[in-house]
Swiss-Prot record:
Keywords: ATP-binding, Cytoplasm, Kinase, Nucleotide-binding, Thiamine pyrophosphate, Transferase. GO terms for molecular function: 8-oxo-dGDP phosphatase activity; ATP binding; kinase activity; thiamine binding; thiamine diphosphokinase activity. It comes from the Eukaryota. Residues 136-276 form the Nudix hydrolase domain. Optimum pH is 9.0. It is found in: Cytoplasm. PROSITE patterns: NUDIX (PS51462). One of its GO terms (cellular component) is cytosol. This is Thiamine pyrophosphokinase. Its EC number is 2.7.6.2.
């Protein structure tokens, strides 16, 4: 690639770069009116959008419209405002009005009111139609200059399949702040998803914000605010493609970055963030002819309220004002787990579960095993698991013996056949005995399975058992599989908020194991060493040898993660 025709940052035409992103000159299209909430403008609606909006179902009931002055949703709560606007956008999506079906993300952005509290949440694919403020995070990851090398910046190229700005250069790591997420949490999550890097809040350097206002071709304005971070690294830190949004990463020296800026190779708002970086690092200095103008335009006053982001994921409802609290993100599922309840006294007799014996010695406490066996709705032996049961107590009768029978002895097979047990031969070599048994159990309408499987001995068997947790989850989100060993129970936590009943496990060891993938842990509670805004992954942070301190442990994650804990004798 040819070198830049400019020899220093002083020659960079910042104004041209800014015009691509900060293109609003302060004059609204005639007929544009404020979109209000509680008497304050939170956005702006152009005549083109207004013409379609007033045709919405129940418009006169759901909206307050004063022609030439303002429009406002006729609702006093966050939830009702969000619901009214969601129905409008869903209708427009169905008809691809304004092309929003092509930009639909199934992700919400938060819109803030004059009190800096959320007043509604809106689909990311349509927020721009109402002139709402969007917020995001941008981080420049760079290797500082040395005697041998100039300053170098990690620059990704956007995937050719991206909905917006495909194949353009981007900031090192960036992303929009979804409804309910925090600034730092979003930044850490984006590092994990886009660059496959474990970054903590201790490493990131907050560098303020940039703000700008874009005038779209159809004349609606798009105000944006980006929280800016720096991350200086050494040569050993290398970002890697992870989520498909990035085609590749390049480590570019400063002169190459200037060259790409000159060519307008960067997505426009990323170029603006880089201008901010160059100013903060003294690369663009007051001697640059557009220095003051650049400073002003990357910190534009915004015509709409800017929200106050809390540390956590929710806001307390402290009054009965119209601007109510933010509920949990609608797409964030909540899961309740009680791994030990099936053998305790407070067992719910309506809870149906299966017991599955794999080909490992039965090493859990005898009273626990017999309680589970008695309470189970169905009892299944996987191949050689029948040998183990017969050796343990030949009087116990399983409902099924299932497998390809490469481990089942002829004597055991004949013994249980004589007892009237269902013997199911499945020769398929592409499925494990666990999978074969799981199919039988699901045919009985049972989702919860307690699997007796030794995790000692062969490592490949232990890893295979953990793989069954992920396999079962891939079949159905209703599946609950608990692996039982001598004094331990392990299961798979799903993305979202998981509440684990640990009232019989307080003081015992536990762990969170990110098997096969990195997992962003938003927050935990009820542990001796809680985690917040961290990436867990092998080769990095793994929360092993933790301790249960409360009757309920809560774990919020963005991906599947193995939960394991000791059980009491």
């Amino acid at each position: 690639m040819a070198m830049s025709s400019i020899t220093s940052a002083k020659q960079l035409n910042a104004e041209e770069l800014l015009d691509e992103c900060d293109s609003f000159n302060g004059e609204f299209v005639p007929g544009t009116i404020p979109f209000r909430a509680n008497g304050a403008a939170i956005g702006y609606v152009t005549p083109l959008v207004l013409e379609i909006l007033i045709k919405a179902d129940n418009f006169k009931f759901n909206w307050v419209y004063v022609p030439g002055e303002y429009i406002e949703i006729n609702a006093s709560t966050f939830e009702k405002r969000t619901d009214i606007l969601a129905k409008v956008l869903e209708h427009w999506r169905h008809n691809n009005t304004f092309g929003i079906a092509d930009q639909w993300r199934n992700e919400l952005y938060t819109v803030y009111g004059k009190s800096k509290k959320p007043v509604l949440a809106v689909e990311r694919g349509g927020f721009w139609l109402f002139g709402f403020l969007s917020t995001g995070v941008h981080c420049t990851m760079y290797i500082p200059a040395t005697k041998e090398h100039p300053l170098r910046i990690w620059v990704p190229r956007r995937s050719p399949t991206k909905q917006t700005w495909p194949n353009y250069l981007d900031n090192s790591v960036a992303g929009g702040i979804a409804h309910g997420d925090s600034v730092i949490g979003t930044m850490i999550k984006e590092f994990s998803e886009e660059a496959n890097l474990d970054v903590s809040s201790m490493n990131l350097i907050p560098c303020g914000t940039v703000s700008y206002i874009k005038m779209e071709k159809r004349h609606w304005i798009q105000p944006e605010l980006q929280y800016v971070f720096d991350l200086p690294v050494d040569d050993l830190v290398i970002p890697r493609i992870n989520d498909g949004e990035v085609a590749g990463f390049s480590l570019l020296p400063l002169n190459q970055v200037l060259h790409e800026l000159e060519l307008k190779s960067f997505k426009p708002n990323c170029a603006l963030v880089l201008l901010d970086f160059l100013i903060r690092h003294g690369i663009i200095t007051p001697q640059h002819p557009q220095y003051l103008q650049t400073l002003e335009r990357i910190h534009r006053p915004l015509p709409v309220p800017v929200g106050k982001y809390e540390r956590g994921d929710s806001f307390e409802d402290t009054s009965k004002k119209a601007e109510t609290c933010v509920p949990a993100k609608p797409q964030k599922a909540t899961h309740q787990l009680a791994p030990c309840k099936a053998w305790l006294r407070d067992y719910d007799t309506d809870q149906k579960f299966a017991v599955l014996l794999l080909n490992q010695p039965i090493d859990i406490p005898d009273d626990r095993f017999r309680t589970l066996w008695k309470r189970a709705s169905i009892r299944v032996c996987a191949d050689g698991g029948a040998n183990q049961l017969r050796n343990y107590d030949s009087s116990l009768k399983p409902d099924y013996v299932v497998g390809d029978f490469d481990s089942l002895t002829d004597e055991t097979k004949a013994y249980y056949k004589e007892m009237g047990v269902n013997i199911v031969f499945d020769p398929c070599q592409n499925t494990t005995d666990f999978m074969k048994c799981h199919k039988i159990i699901k045919e009985h309408g049972i989702d919860t399975i307690f699997v007796l499987c030794g995790m000692g001995g062969r490592v490949d068997h232990a890893i295979g058992n953990l793989n069954h947790l992920f396999w079962a989850a891939s079949i159905s989100e209703k599946n609950e599989v608990f692996l039982l060993t001598e004094l331990n129970v392990s299961t798979l936590l799903q993305p979202g908020i998981n509440h684990v009943d640990c009232h019989d496990n307080i003081g015992l060891h536990c762990g969170l194991l990110p098997v096969g993938q990195s997992v962003y842990v938003k927050k935990t509670s009820g542990l001796e060493w809680n985690i917040e805004d961290r990436i867990c992954q092998f080769g990095g942070l793994v929360s092993s040898c933790n301790v249960v301190t409360k009757a309920t442990v809560t774990i919020e994650v963005n991906n599947f993660i193995v939960w394991t804990m000791e059980t009491r004798l």
